[in-house]
């Protein structure tokens, strides 16, 4: 425990004694860093009071000092404004400044408020604002004493804004630490910004808004729309009479002084929501550069690499929705441009009004105002507080209009589509005189509540061409000053556009109906004279299961259920989730370069796709494609280039992690935990541990996972599709297998011979310093068990698919001490007790011989897979003295075995054989009746065998229990001939081998199944006494 740590700060103890009155002249002008700061601004801790009283001499009016302190605290706490769990609780307890004075003069007990600290832990990078009952010094010492649990780097990297303490124990944040060490931390208050805050005059409009903002805090942020109206009033009072010269490369501080005042108001309102981290970066960087009067460096864009859509944790999203569920806001805006036609795609509705842009002739840049407004219209609602975004963008766009082009481009990268609704505010600075034209407003439903549909999560994504197209065309007019951008397909095919979002555009904002959402069934025409407001539909509210926040005194979380819309009505604006699923993280996308429409279609054919600048015919075609692909039960990340990639083996998919899709060398992130191979286009999954050989770089039967990192040799046990899945002629890594399996790979799959390593049976070979022996697995031709002997002496046996037999006890396994056994557990349950293979083969021989003896025109049919069951039909053919007739394809497959006994008994002449082979799926009455007709009347009876272990039952413990299914002249015997070990055979093999560790390789998908098999393994050990 540190000596300077106050006990009341640790225990959050507040004395009930009357605090000493603070003289108005004793207010400190600057609050020192790393000192406890309260977000509500109504009192300091006792430690701060003591430090304040020790600094007499610095005099200032008490009210001005209080307001300044509040603004500095707000700026200092911007590091943790992306998640305001603590701030919202403290804001609910806030009072106005007048009430504060009464509290200080009276004996009323001060409400207990949890302190919020600035800064980050230098060890784990956790923000100090997330501390509960700890001081920063206390946490740092504990963090240094207890190393992190995992060495896994945080998947969000530099964009991590989590405020959950356990998150920083579960993941490391090395990249974030390096970034904060090499430059000023993102969102930290700059001295220049603080100086601009302090420079505000007492009589400035910001001081008036200061009191208004304090009044708004008492409303617990329940009416977010009031902020928008308040911003209009502020802009009317603070806008300078003469317009700022936008041609200046570096503006003096005197020209930018009104902007930090607005920023002060924004910061004091405590920006909350998904866009807050990026908003603070833009605010700090712009205000700092403005105060220094220097242009931003051109490499800021490359160094920031900030994604357009920030991610939220579940806790962050809860707090955001808690505010937004109580908000009532709709934005009305219009946009003026020359010859600009935007395609309406369901996420927002535009109406373009033709208006003159007199400043365009003067060489003035269109800036990012219209671009930001377009980005908002194409972006999904991300749960951010729209009024805060509104205020921030009015400040940012004003700064953008004064800076050189690199400034505009750098700041544009910092803007999030979630904040882009504030683009409406950007035009207030130039269209003040036209704010009284309500008939020109176009309503845009914010739809920020998260809507729910029963089964699927639809996370809308923003069309990147919408942003880049709007940026690249106006910037090209500047003659080489813009950053290199690849022109989009919409630019190539569409007509040229002129200066979207010119400064003369009319824009305004007002409140509208409560909780409304726009119907998106048809596009809105671009009429310059008669703009219309689209009707809105109220959403229905449903109460869900009580959440944990209610236990801690928070209001119950309310969630919206949107009405089901048909495909013709277009997609939902808000992401929807299943009632039983977690909320999906919003997709984040890199803002590196523009994508053409065709590239984007290949990657993102979903409901939220937006396109711009297409011709009328193309637009109609695209619209039809959207309508045919819209389905309320499909998530956006499930579509791949016009078709669905549904794989039941994927299992539950985590939507809170990054989902990487690769198309033409580009990567885009979404909300699933799988990746797609850029070459084969197949879904790639992580190779499970039971297919990796520990201590080596070997994998066994793991071709469906693509190229596995760290794998030096791929082993294939046998040629069955569930084991060689993913192996094709394009595979270029070494494949180790038996000679028969290698032949099948060459002939059937066309795998290049140079990559096939055929190993002899029962012979010790060395592969990467590991001794390898292939043993007969008694499963199908070429099937092997693989015995590995590592350089350290460890012995590992992988059985692949095998049928245990007593003859294995006389193989090279005899006398071996096996440390780890990878066991085929297909039938690892006592109910699987079927006869041995020899008994079943003998039963089939006797039955077939009897039937043919009684009826010489009887035909024997055996069902087979690609390879396997050869012992059954070869034994029957040998007894009957006949060849086995089969299809041409099956004949070629069996010829690959290079077994003389097999080659001498097979033929493609069906009429010259008494035994026929058919696919296993055709062994039914309908298929056999059809096959009998094909024989041309040569046979009048069929005796069929379906050799599979899946037909067993508890009553079949011997061949005497086998009863055929008969219909007319067709009889089908389901014989329990399995090529996998029965439970008793498996038990005998394990008890003989006595491995130290058993790893099951089949039926391991559930914890219950794995736990059950572990119990069996323990019983076997106890019985065998090892």
From Swiss-Prot:
| Species annotation | Mus musculus (Mouse)
Q: What is this protein called?
A: DNA cross-link repair 1A protein
Specify where the region named Disordered lies, as residue ranges: 12-110, 474-542, 560-590, 602-651
The protein's matches in Gene3D superfamilies, at most eight in alphabetical order, are given as: 3.40.50.12650, Ribonuclease Z/Hydroxyacylglutathione hydrolase-like
Family of the protein in this entry: Belongs to the DNA repair metallo-beta-lactamase (DRMBL) family.
- Report the protein's function: May be required for DNA interstrand cross-link repair. Also required for checkpoint mediated cell cycle arrest in early prophase in response to mitotic spindle poisons.
Task: List the keywords (alphabetical).
Answer: Cell cycle, Cell division, DNA damage, DNA repair, Hydrolase, Isopeptide bond, Metal-binding, Mitosis, Nucleus, Phosphoprotein, Ubl conjugation, Zinc, Zinc-finger
On subunit structure and binding partners, the annotation says: Binds constitutively to TP53BP1. Binds CDC27, which is itself a component of the anaphase promoting complex (APC). Binds PIAS1.
Subcellular location, record wording: Nucleus
Please give an example of a GO cellular component term from this record.
nucleus
Protein's GO biological process: cell division; nucleotide-excision repair
Q: Name one GO molecular function term.
A: DNA binding
Q: Where is the composition biased (Low complexity)?
A: 71-82, 527-540
Compositional bias (Polar residues) spans?
569-581
